[in-house]
Amino acid sequence: MQDELFETEKAPQKNAKNAKNAPKKSFEEHVHSLERVIDRLNDPNLSLKDGMDLYKTAMQELFLAQKLLENAYSEYEKLQTPNKKA
């Protein structure tokens, strides 16, 4: 369970079957993916369509990274409160 706390499934795929079988990514992997996308978004020769696709990808990575942070914070709070079940 502890490992699951810090990993999410990769960003949703168009095909739902692929999303279920996708390997999990860590918070750091989501942040790294987000950084790569931001670098690509800074390309002045990027088309509008490609920019929008990259923006969607960035938002998915950000959402998943935020979920991991929320999960970690929730677990932290449970550990700080000994009266509650962890």
UniProtKB/Swiss-Prot annotation:
Q: Which residues form a coiled coil?
A: none
Q: Single GO cellular component annotation? A: cytoplasm
One of the GO biological process terms: DNA catabolic process
- Gene3D superfamilies assigned: Exonuclease VII, small subunit
- Per the record, what are the reactions this protein catalyses? Exonucleolytic cleavage in either 5'- to 3'- or 3'- to 5'-direction to yield nucleoside 5'-phosphates
According to the UniProt record, where is the region Disordered? 1-26
Record keywords, A-Z: Cytoplasm, Exonuclease, Hydrolase, Nuclease
What SUPFAM superfamilies does the record point to?
Answer: XseB-like (SSF116842)
Q: What is its EC number?
A: 3.1.11.6
Superkingdom, according to UniProt? Bacteria
Q: Does the keyword Cytoplasm apply?
A: yes
Name the predominant localization: cytoplasm
Pfam families referenced in this protein's UniProt entry, alphabetically: Exonuc_VII_S
Subcellular location field: Cytoplasm
One molecular function GO term is: exodeoxyribonuclease VII activity
Q: Among its keywords, does the record have Nuclease?
A: yes
Similarity comment text for this entry: Belongs to the XseB family.
Record's function text: Bidirectionally degrades single-stranded DNA into large acid-insoluble oligonucleotides, which are then degraded further into small acid-soluble oligonucleotides.
Task: Give the NCBIfam families listed for this entry.
Answer: PRK14065.1 (NF010668), xseB (TIGR01280)
- Complex formation: Heterooligomer composed of large and small subunits.
Quote the protein name from its UniProt record: Exodeoxyribonuclease 7 small subunit
- Name the gene for this chain: xseB
